[in-house]
Amino acid sequence: MTLWINGDWITGQGERRRKTNPVSAEILWQGNDANAAQVAEACQAARAAFPRWARQPFTARQAIVQKFAALLEAHKADLTEVIARETGKPRWEAATEVTAMINKIAISIKAYHARTGEQKSELVDGAATLRHRPHGVLAVFGPYNFPGHLPNGHIVSALLAGNTLIFKPSELTPWTGETVIKLWERAGLPAGVLNLVQGGRETGQALSSLDDLDGLLFTGSASTGYQLHRQLSGQPEKILALEMGGNNPLIIEDVANIDAAVHLTLQSAFITAGQRCTCARRLLVKQGAQGDAFLARLVDVAGRLQPGRWDDDPQSFIGGLISAQAAQHVMEAWRQREALGGRTLLASRKVKEGTSLLTPGIIELTGVADVPDEEVFGPLLNVWRYAHFDEAIRLANNTRFGLSCGLVSTDRAQFEQLLLEARAGIVNWNKPLTGAASTAPFGGVGASGNHRPSAWYAADYCAWPMASLESPELTLPATLSPGLDFSRREAV
């Protein structure tokens, strides 16, 4: 029984599915997808639970969320292992994901009060009050790269605001989704407030097409995001928040500390085996001897990265990709770029055929035409050389995406110029592209998304503002508008 609907664990009636470890092929989870009728049942349960949940005092909702945080802390080791085994991440990185989930609780509570909550301004004859109300029933679509942390940011914020939810994890990480929901169950959520439906494309389409849905919060690929946008077009009454991918540039100017720049680049491009939406996909390196030395050192150090199993000791910097098919897609993208005229600086290599273990690849594409503007979700870094900083900014903006952008430079003036001219939601200076603060908004422009539904601004998309002018007494104004006559006529 792998679906949780209206407080009950039930068996899916859709397609049979199983999840294996992407390196060892060990079977981790088996179950059936939710069919369309079960998706509709989950929505009905959420709708029925909404009025009572929304009317709960905020402190009551907060208490359940904080109980969930305590359960995350108590089961940190177990959840770390689930995430690591299911995604192929090294244990150390999965542990940081669970820590981020725990920390997000306190941040989300602060964000609720700062971004939404209630504010009152006293007037001469009353008060002006701003309140926020939940949308109603929201769907949350989770990604596979951070199957615990990223959906958690939506779910916690939405529940605090008083919404009820249907959560569909990625079909590639059903085990993590189920494990997290069982902790919510133990935290004491009332039946129907949060519902779990497992499945792939058909389940997702059934969920996003429900008439009784008030909104959808999505994190994932641009292709799926665009499909959801088309599906919900003509429905302005529904909130649709899309956090999608990026084809992110990292600019390397003249640097004094080459090893520090190489370390920053490795953290930007290859952490999580390149499976972060903010990962550097395009490396823009200034022409000249220093740029040559930087690239040579990057190739040297990146060539020593050996992806390993989730439980290797000593631990590896990167693990496997989410699946062997994902690794094959990265290999095909590398070969495509070679066929276009790219010059391989570091060849990607499958560590073992049939697994998702893939070494990093680096390919130079300076002067190559018709390079696809796409997000290759894996450890493949494309290099362009440039002559001057204005050209670097032009190259950086030469994409339909706009998620993250970074600069390695000692020149503050260059960073100031980049801040003015970069088309990206996150712009970092001498910091990895993959570094982001949960106390700041997270998201991008263009094909990278339409809002900031993650991190600090998540609260904004989980409630709508209600403005009120109010007075405990009704009185006639001392001064009337022109043309109004309230004088009493003498009776004839």
Curated annotation (Swiss-Prot):
Active site residues per record: E243, C277
Pfam families xrefs: Aldedh
Positions annotated to bind NAD(+): G220, S221, A222, S223, T224, G225
Reactions the enzyme catalyzes: N-succinyl-L-glutamate 5-semialdehyde + NAD(+) + H2O = N-succinyl-L-glutamate + NADH + 2 H(+)
Protein's GO biological process: arginine catabolic process to glutamate; arginine catabolic process to succinate
GO molecular-function terms, A-Z: succinylglutamate-semialdehyde dehydrogenase activity
Keyword annotations from UniProtKB, A to Z: Arginine metabolism, NAD, Oxidoreductase
EC numbers: 1.2.1.71
Pathway linked to the protein: Amino-acid degradation; L-arginine degradation via AST pathway; L-glutamate and succinate from L-arginine: step 4/5
TM stretches of this protein: none
UniProt similarity note: Belongs to the aldehyde dehydrogenase family. AstD subfamily.
Database matches in HAMAP family: Aldedh_AstD
Function: Catalyzes the NAD-dependent reduction of succinylglutamate semialdehyde into succinylglutamate.
Protein name: N-succinylglutamate 5-semialdehyde dehydrogenase
